[in-house]
Every structure is written in structure tokens, then in C-alpha cells.
A protein has these predicted regions:
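An anion-binding catalytic pocket shared by soluble metabolic enzymes
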Residues: 75, 80-174, 178, 189-195, ...
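Glycine-rich, small/acidic residue-mixed loop/short-helix segments
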Residues: 239-245, 249-356
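Contiguous alpha-helical scaffold segments within structured protein domains
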Residues: 21-50, 54-57, 76-85, 142-252, ...
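A short glycine-rich, hydrophobically flanked beta-strand micro-motif that places a catalytic Asp/Glu
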Residues: 3-6, 71, 105-109, 258-266
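Glycine-rich, N-terminal phosphate-binding loop and its surrounding beta-alpha-beta segment
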Residues: 1-28
């Protein structure tokens, strides 16, 4: 078995381990998790909010000219804390992530550094990913591409309105169609008996609604799950479509090296059974600071301010495990209280919640 992470640029070396011992057990209930009381100071952003809006406008121009259909643009924020040192205990941050995101793929990976950019120093990668790229068991595969996002409401009525708005949003439905179509094309080169719903479903996290399409099938005889994984990655959910111009645009304009952000994290055994999720809703923890990442899918109808707010909303998954930011422009909005009820319902596609 190997466990670890593969970078966004899969041509680069990953962080993979062959464990001496593997323990598989039900994750313990997080119980009562004390909220952090420290205040976080912003010490860096790449790009800053104004810069992010500029590159979104540039991307929209490129898309409307026919250079590509979609590109996912990310940004990073680095924060430090001068009080409440318990915020930086990785086990506490992990417990908060698990408590707040019980349906996510919650992960921790200790890093030795030396990867350059944001991952050049030793640190701890932590996150709560909502997105399954590939799960395989006895040649049956599952995937759950997500694209199209809206912030959750702060009360049941506004939460219902948000969910309905997402399901009827032409911009988000078009963005999701690019992703699901590309995933199905990749699966078709490796998989038979593909099954999927006729349209996207709502997938909930504590802070956002996503559009998701659960897809499953049977791995073709003689095909490798690893080959399929590398054919899928990076999906248009974190890169864009077509992949080559989107990747080139990201390299030219985003302004930082993603490293493991928007990469893959998971495991694979000797039989090819595996489970790999995207490195999203994540950050790297150091002794005195943390760096988090979020991105948004840009299409022809994208509005720069709305896309900035989307990255802000997504960062809230990680910031809520650390503390509240002092500088609101970093995340773009204050952290709201979660909805007290979910009247719409919370679809949990089999692709994302298959038991092992």
C-alpha cells in the first residue's frame, strides 16, 4: 500500500509513503471541540483581492475570445496568530475540521519540505475535502466531480433560496457541464457500464452548496486504476477545460506555485483498490503561521466580485478551524453562524460515501 499526496502538476514528484503498519478504524466522534479564541493576522496574500479580480477579468476575456471554455483560478492567504497558541496544535485543528465537516474527507499529512514555493518548509497539510476523484474496490469505480458553488444561507429559508438559486443558475450549470463531460470522457477510456444521473445533484458542506454528479462504473479488464487516476487528474474542477490552455493560463497568471494544493490525497493498495480526494478546503500549518488555498471556476459569465466571494466562502472551512480573521478583505466576508436546519435536504451521493 502507498499513502500520501500527488501535486496539482502530476509531472512533479509526490509525497508518498509505504506504511509499515496500517490501522483501519472508525474515526472517533470529535465530541465537544472548544472553539479557538485567538485572533489571526494576515501577513500575505497571493494574489490579493484586487489582483484576483484582475486575473478573473483577464480569464473571462480569454474565454470569450475562444481560448478556452473554463479555467479555475486560486489564491492563497497566509495568517499568523499571536495569542491562543492551542490553535496551532494540529490535532486540535484536525478535530475542528472533523467536527465541522463530518461528511468530508478529512486528512493530515506531515511534510518534510523541499518541494519549493508554499511547500518548501516542513509543515503539516490539513484539510476537509468534499470531492472524491476516484474510489476503486474490486474493479468497481466511483467518482464525484463538483463544480458550481453558492454560499449556504444563515437560516433555513435563505438556505433553501440559495440551493434553488444554484440549481437554476445558468452560469453554474454550464461550469458543471464542462467538468462532468470531461470526467465522463476520461472514464470512457478505461471504464465500462458507466452510470450517472441525468443532471447534477446538490451536495452540501457546512459553508457552501455544490453541484455534484455521482458517477460509477466497472474498470475495463487489463486497465489500471492508477492509469485512470492520472488520466482524470487534474480534472476541470481544479484546472479548467481544455486542460492545456487552462493549465498554461494558471501558470502565467495565478502568481504562485500550487504544489499540493488542488492535488490528490489518498491511498492505493497492491490490488488497485484506492480512494483519492482533491486537496481542497485545506491549509499548511507551521509553528507560527498557516497558509490556506481556495479557487473558483471561471467561465464566460463569471463576475470577478462573485468569484472572489466564492474563494472567500471556501476559505472559511479552514479559517473556522483556526480562528476568525482580523482583516475581512482576505476572506471577503465574516464567518456566519451555520443554518439551524436544512429544509432542502442533504443529498449524499453513493459515489462520495461508499463504505469500505
Amino acid at each position: 500500500m502507498v499513502v500520501g499526496a500527488i501535486p496539482f502538476d502530476a509531472r512533479r514528484p509526490g509525497v508518498l509513503y509505504r506504511p509499515v503498519r496500517v490501522v483501519v478504524e472508525q474515526a472517533p466522534s470529535p465530541g465537544a471541540v472548544v472553539a479557538p479564541t485567538g485572533r489571526l493576522d494576515v501577513i500575505g496574500q497571493s494574489p490579493d483581492p484586487d489582483g484576483y479580480r484582475r486575473i478573473v477579468r483577464k480569464a473571462v476575456t480569454a474565454i470569450r475570445s475562444g481560448a478556452m471554455d473554463k479555467v479555475v483560478l486560486g489564491r492563497c492567504a497566509t495568517v499568523e496568530v499571536s495569542h491562543a497558541s492551542e490553535v496551532w496544535r494540529p490535532e486540535d485543528v484536525l478535530a475542528r475540521l472533523r467536527a465541522s465537516n463530518p461528511d468530508a474527507y478529512v486528512f493530515r499529512l506531515d511534510l518534510d519540505g523541499g518541494m519549493g514555493g508554499l511547500f518548501d518548509e516542513p509543515g503539516i497539510l490539513l484539510g476537509a475535502s468534499p470531492e472524491l476523484v476516484l474510489s476503486c474496490s474490486d474493479s468497481r469505480i466511483w467518482t464525484l466531480p463538483l463544480a458550481g458553488t453558492i454560499a449556504r444561507g444563515t437560516d433555513p429559508a435563505s438556505d433553501i433560496r440559495a440551493a434553488r438559486a444554484l440549481l437554476s443558475s445558468g452560469k453554474d450549470l454550464a461550469e458543471h457541464a464542462h467538468v462532468s463531460r470531461a470526467v465522463v470522457e476520461a472514464l470512457g477510456r478505461h471504464v465500462d457500464d458507466i452510470e450517472m444521473p441525468s443532471g447534477p445533484q446538490l451536495v452540501a458542506t457546512p459553508v457552501v452548496w455544490h453541484l455534484g454528479t455521482p458517477i460509477e462504473g466497472v474498470l475495463r479488464e487489463g486497465r489500471s486504476p492508477l492509469e485512470l487516476l492520472y488520466d482524470l487528474h487534474p480534472t476541470p474542477a481544479v484546472c479548467g477545460w481544455p486542460s492545456t490552455p487552462a493549465r498554461d493560463f494558471i501558470a502565467r497568471c495565478e502568481g504562485f506555485d500550487r504544489g499540493l494544493f488542488a492535488g490528490l490525497i489518498g491511498w492505493m493498495d497492491v490490488n488497485g483498490d484506492c480512494e483519492w480526494a482533491l486537496v481542497l478546503r485545506a491549509g499548511v500549518l507551521h509553528a507560527d503561521r498557516a497558509t490556506m488555498f481556495a479557487g473558483a471556476g471561471i467561465v464566460a459569465a463569471s463576475d470577478p466580485a462573485s468569484e472572489l466571494r466564492e474563494t472567500a466562502t471556501k476559505m472559511m472551512t479552514f479559517t473556522s478551524a483556526l480562528g476568525e480573521l482580523v482583516d475581512p478583505p482576505v476572506i471577503g466576508l465574516q464567518i456566519p453562524d451555520p443554518p439551524t436546519a436544512n429544509a432542502v435536504g442533504r443529498p449524499t451521493p453513493a459515489a462520495s460515501r461508499r463504505p469500505h
